């Protein structure tokens, strides 16, 4: 079997619930492996590192990028991915998470889960005897943040000292961007309306982690302050899944936080625009920005594949 990096920190058997659980060295290793796997894919090199391995994918929420990228990633690595929706599982009929975790652990080599409740993922990981990967909860979206950091790294050549501005709702994506900024030395400024701030416990945990890398994490209600001299500007939908009923109310509150051409003029000339998708053109971002020359959204979406392949290989074979 071809090997990845020769000198690696073994992550075999670990869970990925939040990047705050990983050291800066471990996060950097995942990014390095993602770059290597991306290059191998570009070169047409086979990467059968997970031959004979199976990934159980539990989806309680709809998904395009997450399902396709994990499924294709496992296939490219020589393994198999099994899609499981609530209607396919007894957990959807009230079976305890403990039983589901223990039983699935007897069948598959890792479990990926996308659900609203972070507590449910923590419970699943507690009882599972195989690695559990958080593919989105109400608190974190670590695989997305790895892809985001990978994209910025490719565009800017380093993350250390670069400024990422996140503008919009202080949601799960925002939490994970704070986490990866803290772990990589990337400065992150978050601009949110009052009442829609990031979870302060998560912010404090990320701030504590940032002391190790020198990253600066800032909260503000002013999107112009966030955008000033930014290397990358990031936004997300104003109403995440589960908050659709608040759409009209949020549109009024978030309108001053729209990412548009005027806001981009405050950033560096080579600023990259990021969005985890799906996007609502004309709401959180204008079409001229998301479809313009600064947009890196499709590179970012592709990098979900490579980042997750790095996670899978690291957790399943330790390389």
From Swiss-Prot:
KW RNA-binding (keyword) present: no
Known pathway: Amino-acid biosynthesis; L-arginine biosynthesis; L-arginine from L-ornithine and carbamoyl phosphate: step 1/3
Residues binding L-ornithine, per UniProt: 172, 236, 240-241
Broad class of the protein's primary localization: cytoplasm
Subcellular location: Cytoplasm
A GO CC term attached to the entry: cytoplasm
Pfam families for this protein: OTCace, OTCace_N
Broad enzyme group: transferase
Record SUPFAM superfamilies: Aspartate/ornithine carbamoyltransferase
Binding site for carbamoyl phosphate: 63-66, 90, 114, 141-144, 276-277, 304
GO biological process: arginine biosynthetic process via ornithine; citrulline biosynthetic process; L-arginine biosynthetic process
Keywords: Amino-acid biosynthesis, Arginine biosynthesis, Cytoplasm, Transferase
Family to which this protein belongs: Belongs to the aspartate/ornithine carbamoyltransferase superfamily. OTCase family.
Protein name: Ornithine carbamoyltransferase
């Amino acid at each position: 079997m071809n090997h990845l990096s020769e000198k690696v920190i073994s992550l075999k058997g670990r869970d990925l619930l939040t990047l705050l659980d990983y050291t800066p060295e471990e996060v950097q290793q995942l990014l390095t492996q993602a770059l290597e796997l991306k290059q191998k894919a570009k070169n047409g090199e086979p990467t059968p590192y997970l031959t004979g391995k199976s990934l159980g994918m539990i989806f309680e929420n709809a998904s395009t990028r997450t399902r396709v990228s994990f499924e294709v990633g496992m296939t490219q690595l020589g393994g198999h991915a099994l899609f499981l929706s609530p209607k396919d599982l007894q957990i959807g009929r009230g079976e305890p998470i403990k039983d589901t975790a223990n039983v699935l652990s007897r069948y598959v080599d890792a479990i990926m889960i996308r659900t609203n409740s972070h507590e449910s993922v923590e419970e699943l990981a507690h009882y599972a005897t195989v690695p559990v990967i958080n593919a989105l909860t109400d608190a974190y979206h670590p695989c997305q943040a790895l892809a985001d950091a990978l994209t910025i790294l490719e565009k800017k050549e380093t993350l250390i000292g670069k400024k990422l501005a996140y503008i919009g709702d202080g949601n799960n994506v925002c939490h994970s961007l704070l986490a990866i900024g803290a772990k990589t030395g990337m400065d992150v400024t978050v601009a949110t309306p009052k009442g829609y701030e990031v979870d302060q416990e998560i912010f404090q945990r990320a701030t504590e982690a940032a002391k190790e890398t020198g990253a600066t994490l800032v909260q503000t209600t002013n999107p112009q302050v966030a955008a000033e001299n930014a290397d990358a500007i990031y936004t997300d939908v104003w109403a995440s899944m589960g908050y659709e009923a608040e759409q009209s109310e949020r549109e009024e509150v978030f309108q001053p936080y729209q990412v548009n051409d005027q806001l981009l003029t405050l950033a560096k000339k080579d600023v990259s625009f990021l969005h985890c998708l799906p996007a609502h053109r004309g709401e959180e971002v204008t079409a001229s920005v998301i479809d313009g020359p600064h947009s890196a959204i499709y590179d970012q979406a592709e990098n979900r594949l490579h980042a997750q392949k790095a996670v899978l290989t690291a957790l399943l074979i330790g390389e």
